[in-house]
């Protein structure tokens, strides 16, 4: 992520100081927000994957929501509560205030996935910005401080706070170049991770062979 952060600053500068003087748009001019669902322990009938605060960790992207936990509901949620590819989800409320305001992008594809009431979903409805670019804007320290206002941490995130955020809108070709860089970086990380897993498996096999 440090490589991605450095590349972002190099290409776009800090989104609050906006050194390249990009055109600014309010976040809610670019899409809409929806608070997540509140579930009840007595609900039953439909099991569905659900993104909760505990799933955020230090992730920037979840591309396989079938690995998320499931919740039981009485009915399938309406479309506005179902996550779609490119949705950005924020932590809205949490006992650990440092987690509030964290965000990630999801790509559930065909896996039906909802999100908990402790989250806010943002859905782009503008073709002026790409999800990968917007996510990195929202994860910068300066934008997180804007969310927090005068406090060190955000007490609770709400749609009013999000609506006050001003997002620089650079040219799409620049955003696409950044998205390609992010994609290549993720592929490299995945390749390295798989290689390390194979080495660990080989090491265990050799240890078993030599030492029983």
Which residues fall in each region the model found?
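Short coil/turn segments at secondary-structure boundaries
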Residues: 20-23, 40-47, 65-66, 149-151
């Amino acid at each position: 992520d440090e490589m991605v952060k450095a590349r972002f600053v190099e290409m776009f500068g800090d989104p609050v100081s906006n050194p390249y003087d990009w055109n600014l748009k309010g976040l809610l001019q670019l899409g809409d927000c929806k608070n997540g669902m509140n579930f009840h322990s007595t609900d039953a009938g439909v099991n569905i994957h659900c993104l909760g605060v505990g799933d955020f960790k230090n992730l920037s992207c979840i591309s396989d929501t079938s690995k998320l936990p499931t919740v039981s509901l009485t009915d399938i949620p309406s479309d506005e509560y179902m996550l779609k590819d490119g949705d950005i989800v924020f932590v809205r409320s949490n006992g650990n205030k440092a987690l509030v305001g964290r965000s990630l992008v999801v790509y559930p594809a065909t896996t039906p996935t909802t999100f908990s009431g402790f989250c806010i979903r943002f859905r782009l409805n503008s073709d002026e910005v790409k999800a990968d670019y917007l996510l990195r804007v929202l994860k910068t320290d300066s934008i997180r401080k804007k969310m927090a206002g005068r406090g060190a941490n955000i007490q609770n995130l709400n749609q009013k706070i999000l609506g006050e955020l001003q997002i620089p809108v650079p040219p799409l070709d620049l955003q696409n170049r950044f998205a390609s860089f992010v994609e290549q970086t993720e592929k490299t990380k995945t390749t390295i991770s798989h290689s390390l897993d194979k080495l660990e498996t080989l090491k265990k096999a050799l240890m078993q062979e030599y030492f029983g």
